[in-house]
Amino acid sequence: MKNLISELLIKLAQKEEESKELVAQVEALEIIVTAMLRNMGQPEQKRVIDQIEGALAGVKPDASVPDGDTEMLRAYVKKLLRHPRQ
């Protein structure tokens, strides 16, 4: 029983580490996108945003992905593009 608990704790720690890495990757990408958008002129920025939103609108979600997840992704992309972090 102790071995099982130990194994579960190790797996949990590994998952937590993977989760931290994913959060760091997302935050890094958010910083990069924000910096790139801020360094563009308004017309270029609008063009890039329109292209990204158009590409996202044209993507048909996989049936295995819950609708809530798809909407969350779309909302986050919109927030990132239209209201980048400060």
From Swiss-Prot:
Under InterPro entries, the record lists: SigmaS_Anti-adapt_IraP
Q: Which GO terms describe its cellular component?
A: cytoplasm
Tell me a GO biological process for this protein: cellular response to starvation
The reply to whether Cytoplasm figures as a keyword in the UniProt entry is yes
Superkingdom of source: Bacteria
Q: Which Pfam families match?
A: Anti-adapt_IraP
Places the protein is found? Cytoplasm
- Can the keyword Ligase be found in this entry's annotation? no
Enumerate the UniProt keywords alphabetically: Coiled coil, Cytoplasm, Stress response
Q: What is its main location?
A: cytoplasm
Q: What residue ranges carry the coiled-coil annotation?
A: 1-36
Q: What does this protein do?
A: Inhibits RpoS proteolysis by regulating RssB activity, thereby increasing the stability of the sigma stress factor RpoS especially during phosphate starvation, but also in stationary phase and during nitrogen starvation. Its effect on RpoS stability is due to its interaction with RssB, which probably blocks the interaction of RssB with RpoS, and the consequent delivery of the RssB-RpoS complex to the ClpXP protein degradation pathway.
HAMAP family according to UniProt: Anti_adapt_IraP (MF_01198)
Oligomer and partners: Interacts with RssB.
Q: Which family does it belong to?
A: Belongs to the IraP family.
Which named protein is this? Answer: Anti-adapter protein IraP
Lineage, top ranks: Bacteria, Pseudomonadati, Pseudomonadota, Gammaproteobacteria, Enterobacterales
